[in-house]
């Protein structure tokens, strides 16, 4: 019996699966069976030369397999059928697959579509392996033929190349033969040709003509070149080239800084993060150094491109370089967005002592040059604005038809978009970087500065006076040298703490062992000596009322007093106003957070959190992520109206916002507008404050608010002091001065959300300053035994509104109420006088004080014994109480007086609200005016109209019959400060010294000592420097065409610098012999070194710049006589004041020195120009760029710190007459001509 054919069924099934999924042709066909000649529809799949068919397209196994190798496929006509089914069958298309041997029945298939039939026939016909083999053979033959042709062509090409080389050799040989033949022909010419000589006169004439032609050509070319050199185009190109050269130097420095960041910090910290006990995690390293390494690689490429362009000088094409840089700006954008988070992570990591120790080790690397990590992290933030300034300067010197102009303008526009974001981020992180820089300067470290919410306010030098028992001052004199030396302290004020440090000789800071870190919430500020204290009276006479006290009452240690002495009355006023404002802010925040906060433990007070205008961007304001000292988002952009609204928002006053506003308001508004706003707030507080702010100020939760709405048109809402005060207010007072005593009762059941002062059950202790107040429990109501929960956030009890307030069960609720009342009493007593007094200048007379009051010489804003303790927070949380912040203000305001508690009915509560708002508005106006007058007195000295407006407003305030005693005293203090004489009258002015200098001089340089000259240079430099009003630093006026009118004092400072430098150069060049000049140089270097010791770095730069002038620097014989020690000292001085790296050495030196000090003004002008040109003052929508204002304010604050600390140097007219004698000064050309006479140029 014949066996069946075996085949690999598994592989066949595998191929069927591939055919069903990836076959060449797939689809349903009708197949005619061989048994009964019926047609059955099957799913066919063609794969290579095998045809599979399945029952359906979902079948896993094929029903049959056909091998198509050697078969043919052709179409056949339709079958003959009866007439009935003819129409249907005519539409079907038939084709046959005929196999290659006889006896095999063909495969009959049909489809419904003709196109489908043609595709199947064509696919089956092409499914033949033999056909493919034949085609391959044909292609191989063609390929071999082409290869032979190519080889033949290569041989022919080599032959032609050889022929060309041979022909070149032949040409060279023929040329050499021609040259040789020509020489031979010359030698073979007849001798008589050379005997025909020209006439000697003709030869002379030709020679003269040749000389004349050469001279004329050279003269013409010289004129052409000279004209071009003097042309504007050449001058522009010279400046353009200089800009490019400076750009290359700056880029070199920047790449070096990035390499230090990566090699000295990033890579070592990555390795440290991989150790067994890592001081930092890899995630923190990535967060701190995001994209730093990529930025370094990018700028290394950019730097190499710049150097390649310089190699092609004078052809400088830079646009394509910036085209390379622009697509990489997204890397910078990620770095910018991460910058603030980076510094916050770094501050958190520094709390780990292991990391801090490791970081100090890295920062001590010589390559870092004493700079900190956060300094290197900030460098990339300044690079894009630096490119913008460079492009701006390049475009200024690039002709409009230049090929690069459009590319440079495009690059500048793209960079400006990123620069705007960068400036905002730098402004937002300025506070973190400042805190970290101060923390690094303190040898012992200071953990409180690692709190990123801590805001820097002020720093400066104060003298700490010694104290003895009972807190009385010992008998010391202000002029005592030992007192100034031993008692000098470097003080730093932050929003939460006050640091007192001593500075070592190396510039590092050391915190005092006792009282080095003062928590402001535990401090009480006393600005004037107690009028009843004889010792304090004497000290006021001794110290000229420049001293003030800070009484510290820590919770875990005995109380002590710190007595500080300011260098001037203006400095004292600035310090005390800032300290007082910080204490007010932190106690207000503590009051609202600990007592009136909801149980959700939210750090931001509820009223602020509920006001979307304080944190949500709008068309007229945009906020940053950074919070200010009042836990409110900082303003990034805002309209003038929104800025004035923030200034007069009665809920809070951020000290950093106030300082920035007062420094920069001239840029976007005028003093008159600010004054009008303050006057409106005082006279019409309800109409001038946004309605939403008023609602959130009271934060009531009444069911029917319509009864409490204030009528804006009500005449009693405007202050009219010509008529008696409103009856609703005056009826509750027994005197023109409103006196009310605080009364406490449980607000349970009250209809009004604020703490109702009209219902009382017990009064406060007789003295607001009593240490242990007692309070009786609230009365019980026998008619109502219900126990509603103590939820003051709703302002309404579950019981009916008609219930008596304080309806409680004695047995169950009294302890809970006692705890609440005790906590309220502590916080309220702390708030007494906080929100109503601002007196800072002069003590009140003793008759104005009642026996129970705090001493009027103490700052009422910071009363003694009224302080907030942390335990109060826990009590507040446990008692689950929440009252609107307006309650706190109501209590604090009501507690200012001492009369018996009045009782009000419900109809009088609206008037009570009016009284609260009026008191808050008065306080805000007085507070702003006090800061304005004490810190910016120049505004009122230069603007008589503004001064009269303030005086009129304050006099109007004094006529208010409802004015509280503390408000009256604060008003009088401000008026006194405005009306007093100029505080600097006792100090010398440059005009007085110039008048003295007009007298005949009696001294010469040789008769004056180096110490005398250095001291008087320092005195003159500081007098000129301190005379610059702060408004001249705004608007870049010193770079305008009318700079003399806009910034006269800055121009005087610049002129004084140039005159002093010219005097030094002229004095040296006035000597005729080498030894005298060398001795003069050595003496001037000694003067410069003494100036350095006196912190007069402006004087150091005046002298070193004079010595580096070309007229002096080229005198090699003179410098050869100068001793090596003097040269080494001069190199040290030059390094200190070098402009390299944006004066990085000078900045570090200024950071480590105590005022008085005279910095180089040009450094700050460069910073201000950098900020001004980097970003505009207003956005495209017309909003004020307040982030830019904040950066400008930081620079002005640093300048004013040095301006306001005077030198105690005695004026010596004989020395200043010599220094200011302009007859001794030579101009630059005269100096250089004299230098050439002294040492002529060596012959080339």
Swiss-Prot record:
Its main location: cytoplasm. Residues 239-425 form the DH domain. Keywords: Calcium, Calmodulin-binding, Cell membrane, Coiled coil, Cytoplasm, Endoplasmic reticulum, Guanine-nucleotide releasing factor, Membrane, Repeat. GO terms for biological process: Ras protein signal transduction. This is Ras-specific guanine nucleotide-releasing factor 2. Residues 201-230 form the IQ domain. It is a peripheral membrane protein. Residues 728-743 have a biased composition (Polar residues). Residues 704-743, 759-814, 843-879 are annotated as: Disordered. It is found in: Cytoplasm; Cell membrane; Endoplasmic reticulum membrane. InterPro entries: DBL_dom_sf, DH_dom, PH-like_dom_sf, PH_domain, Ras-like_GEF, Ras-like_Gua-exchang_fac_N, Ras_G-nucl-exch_fac_CS, Ras_GEF_dom_sf. Residues 759-774, 781-806 have a biased composition (Low complexity). Residues 1009-1241 form the Ras-GEF domain. Residues 706-715 have a biased composition (Basic and acidic residues). Functions as a calcium-regulated nucleotide exchange factor activating both Ras and rac1 through the exchange of bound GDP for GTP. May function in synaptic plasticity. Residues 22-129, 466-584 form the PH domain. The gene is rasgrf2. SUPFAM superfamilies: DBL homology domain (DH-domain), PH domain-like, Ras GEF. Residues 631-745 form the N-terminal Ras-GEF domain. Residues 147-189 form a coiled coil. GO terms for molecular function: calmodulin binding; guanyl-nucleotide exchange factor activity. Gene3D superfamilies: Dbl homology (DH) domain (1.20.900.10), Pleckstrin-homology domain (PH domain)/Phosphotyrosine-binding domain (PTB) (2.30.29.30), Ras guanine-nucleotide exchange factors catalytic domain (1.10.840.10), Son of sevenless (SoS) protein Chain: S domain 1 (1.20.870.10). One of its GO terms (cellular component) is plasma membrane. The Ras-GEF domain and the N-terminal Ras-GEF domain mediate Ras activation. The IQ domain is dispensable for the Ras-GEF activity.
């Amino acid at each position: 019996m014949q066996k069946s054919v075996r085949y690999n069924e598994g592989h066949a099934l595998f191929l069927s699966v591939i055919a069903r999924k990836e076959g060449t042709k797939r689809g349903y066909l009708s197949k005619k069976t061989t048994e009964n000649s019926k047609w059955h529809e099957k799913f066919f799949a063609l794969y290579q030369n095998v045809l599979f068919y399945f029952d359906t397209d979902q079948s896993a196994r094929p029903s049959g397999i056909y091998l198509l190798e050697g078969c043919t496929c052709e179409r056949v006509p339709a079958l003959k059928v009866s007439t009935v089914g003819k129409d249907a069958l005519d539409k079907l298309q038939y084709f046959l697959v005929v196999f290659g041997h006889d006896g095999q029945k063909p495969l009959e298939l049909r489809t419904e579509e003709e196109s489908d039939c043609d595709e199947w026939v064509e696919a089956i016909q092409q499914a033949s392996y033999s056909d493919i083999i034949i085609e391959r053979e044909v292609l191989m033959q063609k390929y071999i033929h082409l290869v032979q042709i190519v080889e033949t062509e290569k041989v022919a090409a080599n032959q032609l190349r050889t022929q060309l080389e041979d022909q070149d050799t032949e040409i060279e040989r023929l040329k050499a033969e021609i040259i040789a033949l020509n020489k031979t022909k010359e030698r073979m010419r007849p001798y008589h040709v050379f005997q025909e000589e020209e006439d000697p006169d003709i030869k002379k004439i030709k020679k003269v003509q040749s000389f004349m032609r050469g001279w004329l050509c050279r003269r013409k070319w010289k004129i052409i070149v000279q004209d071009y050199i003097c042309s504007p185009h050449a001058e522009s190109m010279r400046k353009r080239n200089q800009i490019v050269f400076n750009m290359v130097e700056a880029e070199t420095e920047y790449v070096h800084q990035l390499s230090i960041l990566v090699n000295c910090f990033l890579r070592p910290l990555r390795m440290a993060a991989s150790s067994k006990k890592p001081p930092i995690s890899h995630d923190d390293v990535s967060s701190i150094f995001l994209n730093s390494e990529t930025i370094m690689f990018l700028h290394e490429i950019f730097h190499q491109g710049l150097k390649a362009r310089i190699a092609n000088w004078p052809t400088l094409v830079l646009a394509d370089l910036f085209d390379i840089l622009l697509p990489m700006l997204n890397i910078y954008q990620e770095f910018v967005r991460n910058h603030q988070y980076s510094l916050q992570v770094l501050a958190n990591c520094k709390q780990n002592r292991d990391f801090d120790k490791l970081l100090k080790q890295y920062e001590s690397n010589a390559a870092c040059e004493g700079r900190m990590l956060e300094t290197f992290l900030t460098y990339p933030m300044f690079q894009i604005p630096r490119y913008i300034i460079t492009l701006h300067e390049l475009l200024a010197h690039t002709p409009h038809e230049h090929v690069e102009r459009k590319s440079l303008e495009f690059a500048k526009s793209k960079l400006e978009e990123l620069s705007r974001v960068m400036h905002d981020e730098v402004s937002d992180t300025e506070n973190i970087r400042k805190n970290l820089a101060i923390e690094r300067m303190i040898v012992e470290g200071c953990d409180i500065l690692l709190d990123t919410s801590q805001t820097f306010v002020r720093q400066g030098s104060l003298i700490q006076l010694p104290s003895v028992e009972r807190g009385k001052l010992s008998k010391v004199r202000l002029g005592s040298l030992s007192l100034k030396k031993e008692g000098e302290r470097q003080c730093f004020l932050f929003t939460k703490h006050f640091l007192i440090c001593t500075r070592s000789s190396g510039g590092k800071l050391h915190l005092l062992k006792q009282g080095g870190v003062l928590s402001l919430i535990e401090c009480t500020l006393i600005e004037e000596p107690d009028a009843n204290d004889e010792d304090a009276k004497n000290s006021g006479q001794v110290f000229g009322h420049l001293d003030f006290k800070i009484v510290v009452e820590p919770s875990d240690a005995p109380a002590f007093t710190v007595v500080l002495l300011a260098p001037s009355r203006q400095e004292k006023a600035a310090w005390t106003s800032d300290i007082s404002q910080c204490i007010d802010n932190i106690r207000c925040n503590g009051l609202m957070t600990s007592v009136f906060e909801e149980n959700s433990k939210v750090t931001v007070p509820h009223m602020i959190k509920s006001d979307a205008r304080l944190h949500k961007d709008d068309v007229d304001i945009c906020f940053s992520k950074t919070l200010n000292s009042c836990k409110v988002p900082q303003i990034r952009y805002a309209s003038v109206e929104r800025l004035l609204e923030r200034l007069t928002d009665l809920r809070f006053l951020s000290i950093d916002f106030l300082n920035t506003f007062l420094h920069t308001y001239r840029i976007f508004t005028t003093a008159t507008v600010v004054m009008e706003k303050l006057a409106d707030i005082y006279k019409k507080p309800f109409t001038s404050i946004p309605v939403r702010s008023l609602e959130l100020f009271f934060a009531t939760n009444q069911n029917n608010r319509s009864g409490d709405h204030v009528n804006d048109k009500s005449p009693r809402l405007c202050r009219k002091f010509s008529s008696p005060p409103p009856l609703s207010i005056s009826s509750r007072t027994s005197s023109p001065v409103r006196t009310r005593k605080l009364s406490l009762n449980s607000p349970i059941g009250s209809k009004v959300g604020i703490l109702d002062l009209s219902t009382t059950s017990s009064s406060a202790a007789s003295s607001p300053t009593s240490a242990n107040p007692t309070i009786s429990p609230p009365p019980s109501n026998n008619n109502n035994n219900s126990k509603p929960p103590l939820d003051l956030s709703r302002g309404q009890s579950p019981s009916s509104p008609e219930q008596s307030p304080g309806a409680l069960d004695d047995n169950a609720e009294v302890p809970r109420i006692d705890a609440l009342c005790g906590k309220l009493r502590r916080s309220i007593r702390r708030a007494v006088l906080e929100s109503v007094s601002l007196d800072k200048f002069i003590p009140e007379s003793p008759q104005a004080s009642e026996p129970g009051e705090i001493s009027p010489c103490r700052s009422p804003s910071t009363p003694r014994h009224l302080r907030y303790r942390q335990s109060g927070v826990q009590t507040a949380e446990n008692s689950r109480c929440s009252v609107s912040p307006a309650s706190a203000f109501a209590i604090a305001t009501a507690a200012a007086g001492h009369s018996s508690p009045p009782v009000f009915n419900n109809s009088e509560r609206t008037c009570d609200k009016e009284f609260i708002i009026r008191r808050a508005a008065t306080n805000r106006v007085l507070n702003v005016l006090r800061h304005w007058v004490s810190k910016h007195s120049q505004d009122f000295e230069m603007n008589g109209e503004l001064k009269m407006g303030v005086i009129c407003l304050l006099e109007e305030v004094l006529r208010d019959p409802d004015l509280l005693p503390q408000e009256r005293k604060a008003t009088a203090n401000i008026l006194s400060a405005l009306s007093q004489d100029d505080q600097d009258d006792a100090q010398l002015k440059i005009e007085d010294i110039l008048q003295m200098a007009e007298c005949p001089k009696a001294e010469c340089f040789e008769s004056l000592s180096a110490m005398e000259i250095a001291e008087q240079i320092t005195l003159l430099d500081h007098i000129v420097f301190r005379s610059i009003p702060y408004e001249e630093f705004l608007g870049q006026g010193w770079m305008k065409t009318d700079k003399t009118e806009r910034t006269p004092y800055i121009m005087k400072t610049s002129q004084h610098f140039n005159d002093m430098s010219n005097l030094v150069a002229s004095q040296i060049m006035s000597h005729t012999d080498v030894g005298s000049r060398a001795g003069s140089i050595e003496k001037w270097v000694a003067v410069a070194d003494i100036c350095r010791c006196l912190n007069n770095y402006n004087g150091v730069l005046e002298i070193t710049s004079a010595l580096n002038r070309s007229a002096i620097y080229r005198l090699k014989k003179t410098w050869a006589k100068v001793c090596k020690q003097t040269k080494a000292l001069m190199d040290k001085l030059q390094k200190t004041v070098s402009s390299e790296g944006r004066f990085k050495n000078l900045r570090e030196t200024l950071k480590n020195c105590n005022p008085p000090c005279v910095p180089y003004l040009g450094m700050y002008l460069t910073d201000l120009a950098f900020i001004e040109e980097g970003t505009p003052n207003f956005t495209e929508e017309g909003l004020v760029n307040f982030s830019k204002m904040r950066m400008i304010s930081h620079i002005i604050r640093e300048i004013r710190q040095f301006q306001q600390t005077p030198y105690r140097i005695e004026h010596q007219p004989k020395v200043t007459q010599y220094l200011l004698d302009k007859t001794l000064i030579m101009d630059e050309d005269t100096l250089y001509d004299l230098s050439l006479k002294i040492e002529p140029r060596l012959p080339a």
